[in-house]
């Protein structure tokens, strides 16, 4: 199968169904480069009033793989706070959110606990939103990993687990979000990882699709630890060229999809693993709507993403699939309102119970939301 929008049977009409319950969005990011540790803090404070100049400077000093992942720099350089998320919601009813670590600049040792403290004090209530849980970060390789986890617990009663990104693509033109390949199989990582089960904590795993087997091995080694795969393990280049050599031709993109299908099916055999349908409009997948100075329509997203959603639900079942927005990381190519609507349309054929599970109950179960 060749993965292009013209490859799929066209959906003749896209309805605008509304959900009769409030959504839980278990994957959002918050940041404020003006007031928190941030890799671009100095730049933002100096040039924040001159966005075009700031964009040019960022594109000069930051690595191209990172810029290709972001697509547009403005969303990463601008504050994204509860009021910004609320504005993006549109007409959808969202009751509760889960904050997932956002690459806090003080990322070593106990520095990561600063992010948990900062998120805990953000005012979601004024936006009629509830902060349901915090997924922080910590490095299982750290000698003080257990103490860092306890510090997160002390910082917030909403702390439920961690994410440690292991996204490392063999194509060096695709941004690497960790400092070593095969992180999830490193001896130091595995030794520290044991603490999560002992402390009743969950793990958000994020890799590229070429690394799914590493998550499978991790899940087998720790069957008592709940693991959720973020962004369906990001099949980079599935919808277009990215990096130096990935997704360059229709046949390459077809191979990416087929390998992703096989590996995800094997991963789904591990019953402690859930999967988030999220992050599927990030530029790293090959989407280039932002280069057309527009966002994808609901219709376009339904056509592009339906094969991924169908396969994920087929292998995991509707009780282990979790909707999440990943906002604002997908904002270069879509609005939050249209993204939610597209997922509603794609999940409607599975029935009302599946809709409730995917948009609400599964997240509540996984993250132990009160």
Tell me what each language-model feature is:
Residues 32-83, 88-96, 157-182, 225-226, ...:
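Active-site gating loops and adjacent loop-to-helix segments of metal-dependent hydrolytic enzymes
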Residues 1-26, 35-87, 96, 310-322, ...:
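Mid-to-C-terminal alpha-helical segments outside catalytic/metal-binding sites
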Residues 27, 97, 134, 162, ...:
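Conserved, mostly hydrophobic/aromatic
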Residues 29, 103, 139, 233, ...:
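Catalytic metal-binding/acid-base residues of hydrolase active sites
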Residues 2-7, 110-211, 217-220, 233, ...:
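Active-site gating/metal-coordination segments in enzymes
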